[in-house]
Amino acid sequence: VSIEKKSIEVGSLEWFYLQEKPEKPADYPPVLFLHGIPSLSHSWSAIIPELASQGFWAIAPDWIGHGRSAKPDKRDFAYTPEAFIEALDAFLEALQIERFSLVVQGFLGSVGLQYAFAHPDRIERLAILNTPLSTNAKLPFKMQQMSWPLLGDMMTQDPLLVDRLLEGGSRFVVPDKDLNVYRGPYLATSDSGRSLLMTLKNLQMPSAMAQIESGLSGWEQPTQILWGVLDPWLPLEDAKAAAKSMANVEFVELPEAAHYPQEHWSGEISESLLTFLRRR
């Protein structure tokens, strides 16, 4: 079985997603993977088969406005955390997913956490890879510039923004075959850059982070934090402080990884995730 590329029309929005259903389904809830900026569902493509081979149905969408999902005009979609949460809720309903385990990474993966704290009864287990978790977290300067008037319009139309962010954030060269997937949407349509700009402009970091900080401290579902220690944007201390505030958490340090750990350390991450997700 290999990864399927699927799309589904939900209301007026088309979602693109990757999924793999297991040949021998085990008695586990599905696992939903949410990407950050400027990653896509593709960033999970080495991990999905590992989970499917162990009986999990694994699903990774491109967020609305990103990758191969719809890129609505800002008049039709607000690009705020609330708008993303509402769209995600409708996507899950369309796939008839009620309870699931959630894996998030990055800026925008953070919206997945906001979703989880609003719907704790739907989350079986939570795994967090390098995602902003504290009110100290700021958008990286390069991403901030992308949301500025004029400069942002220019920067977000340059497909090489992908290379700069992914390689700057992961501190490693990202293979061309992967960069081609990430650049593709920006080469295909100027809507991709516009949607990215709107997303960055509307992340509402201060209020989102306050929400996430308080959400984590009241969170009781089993959680695994997998942290690329060399992240240039999100310090290890902040992640550890967040973990300290939580009831039921294990912390896994990935000593050589940085902001996008799943790009280069998918083997270690799959192994950790499987141990965690299979626990009863």
Where are these regions (language model features)?
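Glycine-rich nucleophile elbow surrounding the catalytic serine of serine-hydrolase chemistry
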Residues: 105-114
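Flexible "cap/lid" loop of the alpha/beta hydrolase fold
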Residues: 113, 117, 124-156
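Helix-loop "lid/cap" segments that line or gate small-molecule binding pockets
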Residues: 160-174, 181-187, 199-204
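A short loop-to-beta-strand scaffold at the N-terminal edge of the catalytic core in hydrolase folds
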Residues: 11-21
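Active-site loop/oxyanion-hole signature of alpha/beta-hydrolase fold enzymes
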Residues: 19-21, 57-104, 271
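Conserved serine/cysteine hydrolase catalytic core
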Residues: 192-244, 253
